[in-house]
């Protein structure tokens, strides 16, 4: 999705005369370079060739904590009054902000307390405590941790270091914009920026639009956590549903953008682009191929957005396009999932469900019909005396015409269902083909997103109660904060509406898949 927010000259003038002057001054006064490095701006030759446009990477993954977040945290903390610094600071975060605050505190000798949810992985807790910060585990989600941080600040007189909604944090992040204008050529056309709470895009936009107003500022969000896109559409900050918030790009999965960032963004952002999980995974690979660095999903948003934005422009885009690679703090366990989704994101793998006759020789005939195609996946299990269902993965060149010809050719002989964008097929069915069950007559099928923490499944089952019988269950760890579960439930006399209502009450994000064609073919 691409959403353009048109700037009026009046809005820009107002921003320049009011807010922009304040932020430019703060950015220029941000004395952070004894801890923060001016990250390199490097060319991405493979991406530039692929897209037919100049692509530059602003390498914030090169910071000591592998993220830009240290800029804002340090800029705020270095200006604290002596008494406040002696008492210490507190922040609620399990990610890059926590590491930024911890590093700044270690450098300045300021006591740091970080509040994290009880389900925070040990690797994240250890990374923060290794820098001398005190880690407190409280609550099951960010809201719980944040509330406890506020309580600690009041009781102990600690200073809260917010992740994005503070002038000094915004100014610290804005030094990236200052650096880009110093490093980039005069042909700079656009800057692509990942958006979570909005501090980064607010800081960069406020500086760049004042100095080089012709440079486009384009924000990029994951489709399932597009808080800034929705806010700019509505003309006000909106709060995304906790159940609907997609955590794949967890570094930018924020329910509501900040007040200050929104005020700047609605005047200084030219467009917002939203990208899918598969597009993010493909962007991670693109960055790897040019840099040999594996960045985190949030860090690849800018490239995913750039790849989506460029082909949609009515005119060829000249000049350089800068993508801010915001971070590279990725859990190793996530790489398998990212690798699997990358081919789909690049449109280099086509996933199909094909029905062939269940009789001797039909399997051979089907393979001959495929010809010399490069097969990436082939799943089959006997389940019906009359017809067989094959889950087929085929490598393609990514061109829609090639895909269309292949489906048309197979479709002349067999019923074919395209499953490449079918989340049920991609996340679950391809890993569990085993034949359809004829023993269950009334079954409802759901995809459920479970938090990866002890007791999550038990909470789900207890919330479901004893009215329902589980007829199917599939779980696969993806190395993220949330696991994906496919569950079949034999419907009792309570009925479908009552079952959906019960699931909503449990509070986990879910999707009903009872009518999904992949289910009809394989489950």
Where are these regions (language model features)?
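PLP-dependent amino-acid enzyme catalytic core
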Residues: 2-456, 463-523
